[in-house]
Amino acid sequence: MKNDEMKKALEVVNSELKKAGISRRDAFKLAGLGGAAFLAGGTEVKASTVAKASEAKGKILIIGGGLAGISTAARLANSLTDPDITVIEPNPKSVSYQAGTTLLASGIYSSKDELVYETKDFLPKGVTLIKDKAVDFNPEANKVTLASGDILDYDFMIVAAGVVLDFGAIKGLEEIGEAYTNGDASKILKVFGNSGITSVYNIDSAEDMWKQTQAFIERAKSGEKLKAIFTAPNTAVKCGGAPKKVMYLVNSRLNEANARGNVDLTYYDNSDKLFSVKEYADAIEKQFIARDMKWNFNHNLVGVDISKKIAIFNKHWEEKGEYDKDLEEHEIVKKNQKVEVPFDFLHITPPQKAPDEIGKSEIGSDKGWIPVNKETLQHVKYSNIFALGDIAAVPMGKTGGTVRKQYKVLVDNLISVMEGKEPKEYFGGYTVCPLITDIGKVMLAEFDWTAKPTPSFPLDPTQERWIWWLMKVYMLKPMTMHGMLSGKA
């Protein structure tokens, strides 16, 4: 990734602003971006490098070479005078731009080639990359066994292996089994076929989603009355806004084709809210109502009958039971009901989990994630192990924006530990979700562990804005690929 991609993005932004009669300076001033030199094409990235490198020594092993792993490796390489860093990653294209899958699935990006990159092209100088998979962990002996049988030792370890897409947990999709966002999609595409079933969570299936969406729109244009449903599972997921983003974008494309009136759009969520932050949930509810998009809570997708085009949900709720005189309260009775919903178009957000070889290992937890102190990102049991990104057991936030805050904290804290000190930096739970609500509009949802909006800019964060669309579509990719993966943004 070269600076010319950032320049190209800025040229596109300038062109769009010019059409609106607004200068880039005025637009960024309006958006409160005056100090964000990186977005304005300035030198924030260069200025963010560590002023003085540490002379701390130690063999550092990083499990996972995606955005979190490579960004961390790069910042460590920039922060140590004599770094000894090895990254374990089986996928040669692990750094592909995952945040762009919703844009690919809606035809904003024309090809997956705009998202897929070779990991070796982003490997920091002096960092060793081993194309293999970690399958066994012995934290007491500081050793990791690879799929090849090789055993590596380490002084310090960082786990950034991401999540597995557990399609196989859904009845009817067992043949797919487990998949990865950047991984092989042959089983996904084979099982989905041309049934109208899609998922934005794999790059190849996201590309196929645009084909399925176009075919669906053509049917709607012909006058057919159709039903599209969008799901969110009963597990933590990466980019929790994606299930809603794709629904908004399908709605937008249907409106463009003057076919929206022939389609019923419904969102089925396992949870009981549209967003974890009330202010954003309220805003989304208003947006759904304005767009005639319906929603149902407490519905978990448990099965799909592909041939009959029926989605099967477990609807769950609680009721008051008998009154307990001793406790002076009613017993809470959990209820379940099987609900079958016919569809013409189905977007599946698969259940997600840490890879079993990690989540169920000695460094994992009962819930399968890597247990870390949510503020320091240090393992709760092993002080020489850290974790970040989707695999870390933090209360909320599995997005690239979360990683952008986490990896800087982790690097500083790891170096402190390497120097024999206590971790001194704290991650406050910052998460950002650029929620695409229309083609040309984004609501920039920023929040942290307070579960309150934490806007970086002096604008109402619950409002949909064109300037955030420009940032999402044109600026975030070069910032991620050029800035974060070099350990500087």
Residue ranges of model-derived segments:
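N-terminal secretory signal peptides
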Residues: 1-23
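Beta1-alpha1 glycine-rich phosphate/pyrophosphate-binding loop at the start
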Residues: 2-10, 48-128, 234-278
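FAD-binding core/adjacent interface of flavoenzyme oxidoreductases
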Residues: 18-34, 41-57, 130-245, 252-258, ...
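C-terminal auxiliary extensions adjacent to catalytic cores
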Residues: 56, 444-489
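A Rossmann-like FAD-binding core segment of flavoenzymes
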Residues: 82, 124-136, 251-367
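Extended hydrophobic secondary-structure segments that form protein cores and membrane-embedded regions
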Residues: 86-90, 227-233, 264-272, 341, ...
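FAD-site-proximal beta/loop scaffold in flavoenzymes
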Residues: 175-222, 339-405, 415
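Internal hydrophobic alpha-helix adjacent to the cofactor/substrate pocket in enzyme cavities
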Residues: 403-427
